[in-house]
Amino acid sequence: MSRNYGAKVITMCMGLSLCLQVPVTALAASPEFARTTEAWAKLRDNVLEYDELEDLIHEYNPTVQNNIETYNKTMKGVDYDDYSRQYLLQAEEYDREAGDATDDVSTITAELSAAQARNKAAIDEKDGITVSWENELAEKKLVQQAQSTMNSYYQLQQQLKAAEKSRELTEANVNATKNRQTVQMATQADVLAAQQSLEDADAQILSLTNQIETTRKKLITMTGWKQDAVPEIKAMPEVDLARLAAFNPAADLAKAQENDYTLKIDTRQAANVTNGSNQKIYAQNVANDTQQIGVALNTAYQSVQQAKAAYDEAALNLEVSQRSMNKASVQYQVGSISRLEYLQAESGFVSAQTGLEVKRLALLQAMENYSWIVKGVRS
């Protein structure tokens, strides 16, 4: 695995030839004893798998590593009272300055500073637990983003496959149009229009190819590889219909509320603040969070149902296209249809195949979005 930062050689080199064979891996966020040898080997190979994304993000994502380092240096073990006490002491010092001031400007300045310090103690500073939750939420959102990026990568692959088959049909149509022109059954304008369609098809293929590469680089860099690395990216998992059938917004709501990071953070800050007006603000935030969790869960559930319906429709479309393809194959073999007509049927079949796969991936993504809300992560 070619990692992006903090490289270290994990075995001793015995001679130059042996050194050249030693894998170089990035420093992970966790100590070596945190995982088994087999688990580390799986993460350090040159293969990216969907079910590894969460662990890869945790160990090798630079944002996560930076958050962990910062937390360990500045916030670990720090509670709200530590910060509150610090700023309240500052407020008391400003109060003394205000009492000792000999002019109105100095008095007002000191009183303002005291008020700001009390406000800082009441609302701005966060304790270690709050920051820890924020870091966990940020990490989980990165995992969610990685899942979505990998899903998009494979959806784009399917779109490219369909575009390439469509281009083959378009090119055949250009040749057929030129042949018709030779027998005065097509005009020069018809030929130019067909050629323009071919140029458009080439432009679409180029655009999709670039999008695929951009998406690939985004995926591998956020999981620890260098931008120019070429790890094997394994296929996406199948849709688990049993998991889908178990989705139940009414039953899942309590768990989603219990896990929701934003709700936990706002609830803790509401308990920490002492200023009456700020307490009202945080209490309202908590109430809003509670309501929004239910809305988000129901919206995500509806998206899952819509994605499932679209997938089922695409499956039926593929069955129809398969029958048309079978018929066209027989007709082409006996010479009853032209090559262009055969390519039309073939292009339609490939479009139906890739369309079904895109809908499957969209369903998988919708299911993941629902599950993330249950796990406490809202967009």
Predicted regions and their residues:
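Helix-turn-helix repeat elements of alpha-solenoid scaffolds
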Residues: 123-130, 164-172, 229-230, 278-280
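Short, solvent-exposed, mixed-charge loop/turn linkers that connect secondary-structure elements
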Residues: 209-251, 367-379
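Extended, charged, solvent-exposed helical/coil segments
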Residues: 257, 276-286
